[in-house]
Regions:
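Short amphipathic recognition helices of helix-turn-helix/homeodomain-type DNA-binding modules
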Residues: 50-53, 57-89
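A short, Lys/Arg-rich alpha-helix, primarily the initiator
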Residues: 1-19
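Conserved hydrophobic/aromatic packing and binding residues within compact polymer-binding modules
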Residues: 12, 26-27, 37-40
Length: 262
């Protein structure tokens, strides 16, 4: 979606359809008339800045895209977009660094909206020792490194399960954001050599682990994602912290041995 070539009504309609809402559904959620919403979408009525932000809130549109809606309607963007090293984000940057450091000796990393690496703690690099150098050159894309044939893929024991998990996660990101760059990444990753279809998880499984073969043995990790709770800056809204935890005591011991020899 390009706010410079599409009218604001068309953009709103695309977001409504992306959220699988009828005009009646959105009008009821936003407490406006269906007629007025229809007029906004077809260009017969020009929405106020407040109305645009209200509709964007109901549609859960990302901050970056809310700025594009405002621009398409002739209004100034509302949400700042600073680089992570901007002095205004010093507090947030310190929080990220503190969280990454505090998670050691377990791996943790910060990524942007396209899954490009922004920062990582000292436990990440030893896990990437078998990755081709060109994949580690900035911008390092975490999903590409995970699934590329010259990345971690040959070392992931349950590659079929992990690949299916990552692609589904990326598909959900695309669904939420409508980001064409993420779609391009999805198409690229989907085109990598695919392992046999994943077998079902054990009946007592509650999540998909990452089972990684390393020089000291096979480690099993579970992961969590942390985001800032109330961001009003585009960069912070799109930043995620991925933290890995050993799934069992044996993996924790293997990780300790790997880091001791790094």
């Amino acid at each position: 979606m390009n706010a410079h070539t599409q009218p604001v009504g068309a953009l709103l309609r695309q977001w409504r359809q992306r959220r699988r809402l009828s005009q009646l559904d959105l009008a009821c959620d936003a407490e406006i008339s269906t007629r007025h919403l229809s007029f906004v979408e077809n260009g017969r009525a020009h929405p106020s800045r407040e109305m645009l932000l209200h509709l964007a809130e109901q549609l859960e549109i990302p901050l970056r895209e809310r700025n594009r809606l405002l621009t398409a309607a002739g209004y100034a963007p509302l949400f700042s977009q600073r680089s992570l090293d901007d002095p205004a984000l010093a507090g947030a940057r310190a929080a990220v660094e503190q969280l990454l450091k505090a998670h050691e000796p377990n791996p943790a990393l910060a990524v942007d909206r396209h899954w490009n690496l922004l920062a990582a703690n000292g436990a990440v690099a030893p896990l990437l020792s078998g990755v081709a150098p060109e994949l580690l050159a900035p911008p390092l894309n975490v999903l590409r490194v995970s699934l590329h044939p010259q990345g971690l893929a040959p070392h992931i024991v349950n590659l079929g399960q992990w690949r299916a998990h990552l692609l589904e996660r990326l598909r959900r990101d695309i669904e939420v954001s409508g980001d064409p760059q993420l779609q391009n990444l999805f198409d690229e990753l989907s085109g990598y050599p695919a392992p046999p279809p994943p077998e079902g998880l054990p009946s007592d499984a509650v999540l998909v682990p990452l089972q990684l073969r390393t020089q000291v043995g096979v480690m099993s990790f579970i992961s969590t994602i942390t985001v800032f709770g109330t961001p009003v800056d585009v960069t912070l809204a799109e930043l995620g912290l991925e933290t890995l935890f050993p799934a069992d005591p044996a993996s924790a011991e293997l990780l300790r041995r790997l880091l001791a020899g790094a």
